[in-house]
Amino acid sequence: MPRRILQGTVVSDKGDKTVIVLVERRVMHPVYKKFIKQSKKYAAHDEANAFKIGDVVQIEECRPISKRKRWTVVTGAAAEAGAAS
C-alpha cells in the first residue's frame, strides 16, 4: 500500500523533533455542490528540528512514532535551502 503524501503549513514547532502541520482541503458539499475548505492538523516527526512556523512542507505517512505521530516531514522550505547551499 503506498504511503500518502500531504502538503501543509507548519503552525507549531514547540515540541522536540515534532511539528504540527495544518493541511487544508477543498471538498464539495454533497447537497449544495459548493466547494468548502476543510482543515486538519497533523503531528509530524522533524528529526533535525529544521522547520519553523510558516514553512510549507510535505509530510509522508509512516509507522507510528508516538501516540499521535504517524507522519514524517519529507520536504519543505528549510530542506530545499539546505540542498541549494
Curated annotation (Swiss-Prot):
Keyword annotations from UniProtKB, A to Z: Ribonucleoprotein, Ribosomal protein, RNA-binding, rRNA-binding
Any one Pfam family match given in the protein's UniProt record, by short name: Ribosomal_S17
Molecular function, one GO term: rRNA binding
Entry keyword Magnesium: no
Record GO biological process: translation
Gene3D superfamilies named in the record: Nucleic acid-binding proteins
PROSITE patterns: RIBOSOMAL_S17 (PS00056)
One Gene Ontology term, aspect cellular component: cytosolic small ribosomal subunit
Keyword Transcription regulation: no
Function field: One of the primary rRNA binding proteins, it binds specifically to the 5'-end of 16S ribosomal RNA.
Self-association and partners: Part of the 30S ribosomal subunit.
PANTHER family: 40S RIBOSOMAL PROTEIN S11 FAMILY MEMBER, SMALL RIBOSOMAL SUBUNIT PROTEIN US17M
Family: Belongs to the universal ribosomal protein uS17 family.
The protein's name in its UniProt record: Small ribosomal subunit protein uS17
Originating organism: Rhodospirillum centenum (strain ATCC 51521 / SW)
Protein's gene: rpsQ
